[in-house]
Amino acid sequence: MPIFNELKLAKELMRFPSITPVDAGTMNFLARKLRSLGFKCKILEFKSKNSKPVKNLYARLGKARPNFCYAGHTDVVPPGKLSDWTVNPFKPAVKKNHLIGRGANDMKASVACFVAAVSKFKSKKFKGSISLLITGDEEGIAINGTKRVVEYLKRKKEKIDFCLVGEPTNQNKLGEMMKIGRRGSITGYLTVCGVQGHVAYPHDANNPAPVMTKILNQIENIKLDKGTKNFQPSNLEIVKINTDNTADNVIPGEVTATFNIRFNDRHSSNSLKKKLNNIFRKACRKSKCSFKISYMVSGESFITVPNKTTRMIQNTIKKITKIKPKLSTSGGTSDARFIRKISPC
């Protein structure tokens, strides 16, 4: 059985230009490496209406329980202007003891480290199984990735007892933090509709712009909560305001705005929708405007209550890095929001 070098394997993975949702051969390469270690691998390709097909991989070594799973992704975000890079982002290089290239941080190097660790560990006798859930749809719209793999595993009655999500977590020092939950995320797309008219004849129009500004001011200043034991306070941010006006002397017929809320376990997406819709309804009724609202829920908040597995991981990190990681729920969403439906993570 081969033993893999983590740096060499990371470089090999990073050479694939797997800009989400393009696979570029990454999953087949990774499956070959895992099969050489004795893993049984299943490449799962999913597609949805108006989206490109996405390759995913579920690999398992052993049949016994507990089944310890590592979750990650091999898709990366676009590299942007190549002239801004000191190296070709898909020709990784080590400079001043740093691995540079797309995926070095998020998160091909993490995948490589776990696979390399397993290649060294598997010669030992251990109880249970080791599995990997790797997607090619984490950086994009995330509808044909981990979410679909979880649905597949549920249908197959595949049991995962604990899942370690290998996303980058530490901002300053390696080992300083591990995530035991995430805030929920909901995005709102609001349109306030009035009556278009000429600015010289405002009595013949109904300007939705002041109504929208009042609404946005109100929701931006809402104190949703003061935070909870495991979560920071929920927060709403306005991210976009727009009208379709192309002239300076026209009162717009409608105004659109987009906002996002990162919320803790004091709320659900449904409770927030109800609260917000009441605000929109009252404001528009008073102004004789109307409104349209749609929402996209990226995930609900969740928490994995610290247990013997989280403590074992915490102690192992401290042993290696000399830092005891803080247990946190900060930051953005991750695919843990899907995996939590079948396993603590």
Question: Positions of the model-derived regions?
Answer:
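N-terminal helical capping/dimerization or prosegment-like subdomains
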Residues: 1-80, 254-258, 272-275
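Catalytic metal-binding/acid-base residues of hydrolase active sites
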Residues: 19, 75, 139, 169-170, ...
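Active-site metal-coordination/substrate-binding segment of hydrolases
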Residues: 67-131, 155-156
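A structural signal for short hydrophobic beta-strand segments in well-ordered beta-sheet cores
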Residues: 41, 59, 92-94, 238-241, ...
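Residue-level recognition of beta-strand->loop/alpha-helix junctions
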Residues: 45, 134, 295-297
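A structural signal for isolated positions on well-ordered beta-strands in alpha/beta enzyme cores
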Residues: 42, 69, 131-133, 292
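Metal-dependent amide/peptide-bond hydrolase catalytic core
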Residues: 1, 36, 169-173, 180, ...
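Fold-level recognition of mixed alpha/beta catalytic cores in primary-metabolism enzymes, strongest
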Residues: 109-118, 122-218, 228
